[in-house]
Amino acid sequence: MFFPEYPAIPLKYGDRGNDVESMQAAMNVILAKYPTHDVLVEDGYFGNETDAAVRRFQQHIGLIEDGVAGRYTWISIFAIANIIYES
């Protein structure tokens, strides 16, 4: 898969861009393992669905559930997505 460098600023609700789209793609790899959750539209917009998915992810792995994709959330998303993708 891929493991892009952390974008140096936390991603949060309302943000747009390639970093958000990359994170959405990685989240979709994870979400595909959990059929009770819908996959995200990979549009590069950090909207309600992306925020909810990030919060669920943070809660599931024991991070602070704030909906912000900071360094630890970013690294965790891509690390887990890569493990799933390569398995």
Model-derived segments and spans:
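Acidic, Ser/Thr/Pro/Gly-enriched interdomain connector segments
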Residues: 1-44, 84-87
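Conserved hydrophobic/aromatic packing and binding residues within compact polymer-binding modules
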Residues: 54
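Short, basic amphipathic alpha-helical segments that act as recognition/interaction helices
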Residues: 74-80
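Short helices/loops that flank or line small-molecule/ion binding pockets
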Residues: 58
